[in-house]
Amino acid sequence: MKKNKILNPKLGVCREYPPVLKEVTVPFSRAISTHHGDSNIPGITPYGFVSEGTPLPPLEKILNTAHVMSVGMRVTFRGVTTRHSTLIRGPYGWGEFAPFPEYDDAEAAHWLSSALEAAYLPPTVTVREQVPVNATLPAVPAHRVPDVLNNYNGDIQELKIKVAERGQTLDDDIARVAAARTALPNARLKIDANAGWTLPQAFTALTALSDYNLLYAEQPVGSINDMKQLRTQLDNAQVPVLIAADELVRKADDPLTVARAHAADLIVVKAAPLGGVRRASAVIAQSGLPAVISSALETSVGIATGVHLAASLPELPYGCGLGTVSLLNTDVSSTPLVAENGRIPVRPAAPEEARLKTLAADHATRTWWLERIKRCWRLLHRGYVTAEARHGHENMGD
């Protein structure tokens, strides 16, 4: 098969990927949707419980083992100063349910599927014992960069820098990236705009920031059309910055649309928003693009799921965004999953009994999260019954 080359001349990066995706026989729609009811079910690969033929665990059982946690942050990250999540225990270990508060139930249900898969289904096969990770630099003032980087253990090989923060300017971003390059002259740098720029702003910013030898820019703009136009503009101007899609994968009705449109050079994949390791693996395989595995500001329990996904992939061309435990004041585990010299070991993570008590959320927060789990479980159960029936019919040739 003829392949397209992804080039970054300044860094000597050459990446190849298939120009045409593998044939998709079933639309990859979101598994749960309050707008489409029972008919909108898993597509290419259903949730792990469907593909494994395993019933969803009973809601009462989930709630009885759920621990709602409240963990402070070292720095403000996406406007968050305290991270709340729910840890769920099952026969195969622990899972973490940590969708951000603003996510609606239809979106949060994917995260519950991922947590339940980690706790109630056997782990998938892995091919490595450790995974490369990047450190993450929030949108802090330039003078704080050295202090934040000191929170990481050992040498930092790759660093993701947050940019396009609301209320900040391009000058702030340039100063932050420059400070990072000064502190880490040999590290691979990449930026994440979280779709915070318009198309003109993104072109201006990436042209300026390319002087710092960026590996790639993650989600600089919000739409697929703007991503395609931005890639074309950068190519025409010979600006050597690759484009990665994140929100266009994890928040899209069809996470493969951005790949089919050739709007990105690589994709950033998080297990939880896609419903778990099994479904996320399918998205990567179908996309035909290099993948970066990332996390969503979770404790070591959630990070372990992302690490497992990364360890199951045959290739990891870039450092994974799985080093965010270092941004927490503490962790639920006494042996947190943090990077040492840019690598994290592949192993399960479990909370320490004492920390389940000391880090427990207050009554109001606990009640809010448990009610959210109930609503999401009902969405999952409704989708599971329909998907399980269709999955069975397809297996019988109907």
Annotate each predicted stretch with a short phrase.
Residues K2, V24-T25, T45:
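N-terminal leader/targeting signatures
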Residues K2-K10:
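Polybasic, lysine-rich low-complexity intrinsically disordered segments
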Residues F28, H35, N40-K190, N194-Y212, ...:
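N-terminal capping/lid subdomain adjacent to the active-site entrance of alpha/beta enzymes
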Residues R166-H308, T330-D331:
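Catalytic core of soluble alpha/beta enzymes
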Residues Q286, T305, L313, T330-I344:
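C-terminal helical cap(s) of enzyme catalytic domains, especially alpha/beta-barrels
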Residues P317-T324:
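Short helix/strand-capping turn motifs
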